[in-house]
From Swiss-Prot:
Gene Ontology molecular functions: ATP binding; ATP hydrolysis activity; RNA binding; RNA helicase activity
Motif Q motif: chain residues: 58-86
Gene Ontology BP annotations: mRNA 3'-end processing; mRNA export from nucleus; mRNA splicing, via spliceosome; subtelomeric heterochromatin formation; transcription elongation by RNA polymerase II; transcription-coupled nucleotide-excision repair
Compositionally biased residues, Low complexity: 19-29
Residues where ATP binds: A102, K103, S104, G105, L106, G107, K108, T109
Region named Disordered: 19-43
Record lineage: Eukaryota, Fungi, Dikarya, Ascomycota, Pezizomycotina
Key word Nucleotide-binding present: yes
Cellular compartment(s): Nucleus
Name assigned to this protein: ATP-dependent RNA helicase sub2
Cellular component terms per the entry's GO annotation: chromosome, telomeric region; spliceosomal complex; transcription export complex
Domain of life: Eukaryota
Record-stated family: Belongs to the DEAD box helicase family. DECD subfamily.
Motif annotated as DEAD box, chain positions: 211-214
Amino acid sequence: MSHEEDLIDYSDEELQTTDAAATTAAPAANGAQDKKGDLTVSGGRPDKKGSYVGIHSTGFRDFLLKGELLRAITDCGFEHPSEVQQVCIPTAILNVDVLCQAKSGLGKTAVFVLTTLHQLEPVPGECSVLVMCHTRELAYQIKNEYARFSKYLPDVKTAVFYGGTPIQKDIEVLSNKESYPNIVVGTPGRLNALVREKKLSLRNVKAFVLDECDKMLDQIDMRRDVQEIFRATPADKQVMMFSATLSQEIRPICKKFMRNPLEVYVDDDTKLTLHGLQQYYIKLSESEKNRKLNELLDSLEFNQVIIFVKSTLRANELDKLLRECNFPSIAVHSGVSQEERIKRYKEFKEFNKRICVATDVFGRGIDIERINLAINYDLPADADSYLHRVGRAGRFGTKGLSISFVSSEEDEKVLKEIEKRFEVALPEYPEGGVDSSTYMA
């Protein structure tokens, strides 16, 4: 079997097939349920004392993390943990399984990065932590988060593996005991190929993490890869799963991988809104979109903007048009080579470009703190995709602005679905525009 056959690029593909057998309801987790405001906490292993924690901690020091981690946290400028971090970290470091759904930008990544680094006792030549996500860009970003927080842990080695790059380079890393990673981050296709080729050994894995887990477990082919990798790990390990959206249907599937997990749902169900993010729509015809976009980019103040379109072809065309109009734009989508995608991602993250035209490959998990404007040039197909997209402009409770173009009957149906799903009434964008002080931090 060729490696290319193993390496499916899941970035822009939605596989609609569902596995009916896998959606059988799992038994509910044991343990009490504690409802505090918009935060629901349940589960946790009953035999573990101290499995439950209030949300009154005021600093990362309260979690009793390693001193090296606390130094790195201070260097990053973090003072107070977010709500989801306060609830999850104290329990997760006790080796309890965690299923966490919290809206975009609330620091879910730091939960598993800090937890696994705190627990890790690195052994040369052994992989102890495995983190999987559905896109290469997100894998690259998670690897960078590990680098940030492990700066005072010199013995910890992290590597990222994803499709679109020569697999031989990955094999070279895994063939050398000096470079063999203690923490592996990657996409399921490439990781499964490395496991099948017996280049990556998972027999010492102690923590198994899925980020944006619903995206991976919803798609049947990706779920099979995840299951195959899961079976290659020891039975006695900690499992943690995170996402901004976890439907009632996907939760039992997640829990099939777990043992009595701590379940944390922040702003559950219809309350999945992004505080501080102003959301508007504009009704117009398809032919009016370019002129209106030009007007918005000319009139609005913003640090960085991300413009979402529905296809790679439209991304290229719009990017070309913007550059012809002297807007500093780049395009990121699955049609761009992997090396070029990472290069463009870094250009945008490092503020060398202010405008990014993207497909849904940038719709989940990507964290670029300067984005404060998101424009849906093409409305997404469903409400959850909308949440992930506009969430790029409201990270960690900061202010932001999102504007969606509505140009067809299908768009109007999606708009109604968004309003129904999140129990909000999206206002039409005012003719006189909006005051920049209301969305500029």
